[in-house]
Every structure is written in structure tokens, then in C-alpha cells.
Amino acid sequence: MKNLAPLLRDARLIVTAGTGGVGKTTTAAAIALQAAKSGRRTAVLTIDPARRLANSLGLTAFTGRAQRIDSQQLVAAGLSSDAQLSAMMLDMRATADDMVRRHASDEAAADRILENPYYQAFSTSLAGTQEYMAVEQVADLLASGLYDLVVLDTPPATHALDFLDAPERLLNALDNRAVNWLYRPKDSGPRESGYGARLLGRGRQMVFKSLNKLTGGPFFEDLATFLQAFSSLFEEFRSSSRAVQTLLRADSTRFLVVTAPYPATVREAIYFRSQLVERGFPFGGFICNRVHLPRPPSTAGGLVPALAAAGVADDMRAPLARDLLAALDDHNRMAERDAGSIRDLAEVAPDELHVVPLLPEDVHDLDGLSRVGDYLLGRIQR
């Protein structure tokens, strides 16, 4: 198994992907910290608003803007005084607003869109928006020239493929024929002129009138008004989407599939890797977190003297020794199970597998993140 050092040296974008609950966010932060330690100007973009993760990076809370990690805290964690590490949480609304302002024909047109209640719902709730905006924000960070590397922690999802599919689903929704019919202006096509245009216009009005009766208000007319105002940006969204797809497939991008050593989770990670390869996304390796490593066997005869030396009362030594031996047996059974999962991953990518053992406590500070990174870079042998 190789370590991640070459990837951290050469990549411009690292995407940590996988199902929820496998340690993606912690892994992304640990990778970003190691990259900063090597001298690269690094930003980590997370979707996880957890205060605990922000605290582990030395921040009070995440914001929608990149925040520079205090240099004194980085020095205390073993980095040089000129190391540069920033972190931010995705703010979907702010990212979408920036796109509208950037691509609208003028300020008045941007304001009409931004103030529309349907846009406000669209920019935060429509399926695929979060994933689309995450990569859009990455593109902005890289284009700023302030960072050598951006690490993207993908949104939590039941299935890791949601991250790859969601932006395309979003654009397909915007291209939907029914949506186009709602917002299409009367003079948008060569056939929509004269009597035909009037007939089509009356048809729309009749449909809207019927739907408004069902919804209790001018819902669809208002929606059509929003879509017509927003339609001028559709091509910009399509263009941005193509640029995003190019970025995700670039030679300087790598996807790290994060998993945990549970059979179902490993199967999904292996399938996700196959889909990455099939779709032309650059696979950078598996990271398997929380792996139980085997411990040497012991006996009550060996434990009792150790308990006595630790000051455990006479009548408690034998029962405690039995409990400790039972716990050791349980641990080694889980280690055997985890070893099977590691073998399954190694069969697929033997040189691209990185293992982080189960740590004695949760990662809650820069030292903990540094320890995770040390395992990924092979500085700590398992």
C-alpha cells in the first residue's frame, strides 16, 4: 500500500466521497492539514455544519466564507509558521446568489431573480442543488489563485453515486419540456405567431386557471414568471455544469473513496469505485477508517499480576481479568472481520488502499487530525 504523499503533492482538487457515517469529513480535514504541513496553500470545503469539526480545526464555527486557521494553532500542531490552511462550510444560497449576480444581464435583472420566493426555494431545496453548488464553490476557490489545493468533503448521501448524478439531474430538470413550456415567451419559436400564438397563450391561461383552483392561488403563474426571469441564466448554468464536469475529470483531480470495514459499506465503496472508473472520474484510492487491528492474546495469569501492580483490590482482580479477556476476544473477532473487508478492497486496488485504525477517542482537535493524517502518509505503522 502506497501512502498519500504524491497525491497531496500533485493534486489540485481532492474529493472525499462515500456513504454517510464513514468519516469523510474528518478524513477531508486531516488530508487538508497534511497538505498544509507540506507547504501547499490549502482550503477544505465541508458540507458538515458540526461545531465539533470546526472546533477540531481551531474555529468557533464554520461560515460560508473561507476562514484562515490561526497560525499559532498550526504551529502548536507541528506545522511551520507560514503554513496556510483555510476552511469553510458550503453556503448554498450565497453561492447561488453569487452565480446569479455574475451571470445576470444587469443588476436589476439579478435583483428580480434574487427577490423571487421561488428562486429562494430553488437555491436551497431543489434536488441536486447542494452537489452542484459544492463543485461550483470549488471552482471559485481554485480560480481565485489563493489556493494550491482544495479538498472537498462531499454531501452526506445514502448512496455515494448521488454526488455524481445529482448535478446532472438538476440540469435535466431545468431542461424539462414541461418547465420550458411554463416559461417560454410567446415569441420564442417560429410556429408561435399569429393565431397559433394566441391559441397557445389561451391554452396556458386555461391550464394556469385550472391549476390555480387546485393550489388556492396564482402558484403556477408566479412560477412561470420566475422561470421566465431565470431562463436567461439557464445557458450559463449549462456552461458552468460543463466546466464543473471537466474539473471533476481533470488529471489534477482525485476521488478518494472513504469507507468503513463493514461488508455492506465496503461493497458499496467497491461499486462506487467501478462507477468512477466507468464514467471517467480519476480514482485516487480507498481510505478505510475505524479498522480494528488484532491484539496479542493474553491470559488471566498474565493479567492478574498487572492488575495487582495497578492497585486493583484482591477480590476484583479475577473478575476484572475475565472481563478484560472477554473484551479482548470481542476485539479480535472484529479485527478478523475487518481483515476480510481489507482483503476485499485490496483485491480491487492493492496499491491504492489506505487504512486508518480505530482510534481510542474521537478526533476533536488538530492533534487528532494530524494523527489521522500520519496514518494516511505512512508515518505511523499499523
Predicted regions and their residues:
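Glycine- and acidic
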Residues: V15-A17, Y119-T124, T253-V258, A327
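Generic beta-strand/beta-sheet core signal
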Residues: A17, L45-I47, L152-P155, L256-A260, ...
